[in-house]
Amino acid sequence: MRMHFVVMVMLLPALMMAGSECRSSCRLTNISITVESEECGSCITIDTTACAGLCKTQESVYRSPLMLSYQNTCNFREWTYETYEFKGCPARADSVFTYPVALSCECSKCNSDITDCGALSQQTLSCNAH
């Protein structure tokens, strides 16, 4: 009986570490963005990085109007912008597409001033046929 207890106590930290690695934590992930330019008559798919995953959060069962409640979401901590220039566009067409590239991620309150705080669609979009 004592041997089983010692083995369980020694395995507990290893099991806890394995469990935390198996969760989908907030991290960089590769995504594809489909961009269509009707003016330029072309459609491309851009590969970039974004932030995705779960963040630890707690929601109180009792909701009080005096206590603000928010949940942490997986957000960009640092990012840069890159541009793609469509080829073969008419002279006055807007041929440049600028998109964000995540460099690092963090769990924080979503800032709706700079972020679309809705859920990211899991559907792969494709260009419309002309």
UniProtKB/Swiss-Prot annotation:
It is found in: Secreted. Keywords: Disulfide bond, Glycoprotein, Hormone, Secreted, Signal. One of its GO terms (cellular component) is extracellular space. Its main location: secreted. Disulfide bonds join 26-74, 40-89, 51-105, 55-107, 110-117. One of its GO terms (biological process) is G protein-coupled receptor signaling pathway. It comes from the Eukaryota. Residues 1-18 form the signal peptide. GO terms for molecular function: hormone activity. InterPro entries: Cystine-knot_cytokine, Glyco_hormone_CN, Gonadotropin_bsu, Gonadotropin_bsu_CS. Gene3D superfamilies: Cystine-knot cytokines (2.10.90.10). The keyword Secreted applies. PROSITE patterns: GLYCO_HORMONE_BETA_1, GLYCO_HORMONE_BETA_2. Glycans are attached at residue 30. Involved in gametogenesis and steroidogenesis. Belongs to the glycoprotein hormones subunit beta family. Heterodimer of an alpha and a beta chain. This is Gonadotropin subunit beta-1. It comes from Cyprinus carpio (Common carp).
